[in-house]
């Protein structure tokens, strides 16, 4: 089902699509604008988030983002999604952005990523995020004001190619980084993750089994 062309939308699925798009864009909007209480309403109670600097529940992710206290806006591009009854997977193409001082130079971090959302609709037909993760693609660090800075390649040798600059910048801020997340430098792992998403999307949960 994942990556197959969607069937023509019905009125119901079109409404689901718009509600999901509103939800995930609102979640990122809240993150970018420090709207922490509103951001919490986007996640299911048993949700899970696993990204470069964080692994835990949705509630903990919001609290940790608040504690980070750093402006890190997202440039959002296209989003594709697939449905199966009350479950959906949405893939949002985005660029993570923030500024960090490195060796007394203000640097701009741009990290291209696919943000992966697993979503579920409750009995009141309200969608919530049940899982959030990323597939990392490429990134860069550039001086905010044109200047020269010496960052030897050796300082990046321990990092993954798909999110080396992001990892470096987060380490500079004092955050540990998970180096075993999906990234396009490990295509087999990305494909494995896609298969896991497809399995989750297409399998029936206990609630569905009880209805049949």
PLM regions and their residue ranges:
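Short, cysteine-centered beta-strand-loop-beta hairpins and adjacent loop/turn segments enriched
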Residues: 97-109, 138-142
């Amino acid at each position: 089902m994942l990556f197959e062309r969607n069937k023509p939308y019905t009125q119901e699925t079109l409404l689901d699509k718009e509600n999901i798009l509103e939800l995930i864009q609102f979640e990122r909007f809240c993150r970018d604008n420090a709207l922490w209480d509103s951001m919490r309403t986007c996640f299911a109670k048993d949700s899970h988030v696993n990204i470069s600097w964080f692994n835990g529940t949705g509630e903990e992710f919001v609290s940790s983002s608040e504690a980070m206290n750093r402006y890190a806006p997202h440039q959002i591009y296209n989003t594709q999604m697939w449905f199966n009854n009350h479950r959906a997977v949405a893939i949002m193409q985005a660029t993570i952005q923030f500024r960090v001082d490195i060796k007394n130079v203000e640097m701009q971090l741009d990290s291209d990523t696919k943000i992966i959302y697993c979503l579920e609709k409750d009995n009141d037909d309200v969608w919530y995020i049940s899982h959030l993760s990323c597939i990392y693609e490429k990134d860069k660090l550039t001086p905010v004001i044109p200047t020269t800075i010496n960052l030897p390649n050796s300082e990046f040798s321990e990092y993954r190619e798909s999110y080396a600059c992001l990892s470096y910048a987060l380490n500079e801020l004092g955050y540990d980084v998970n180096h075993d997340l999906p990234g396009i430098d490990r295509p087999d792992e990305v494909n494995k993750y896609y298969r896991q998403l497809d399995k989750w999307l297409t399998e029936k949960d206990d609630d569905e089994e009880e209805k049949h």
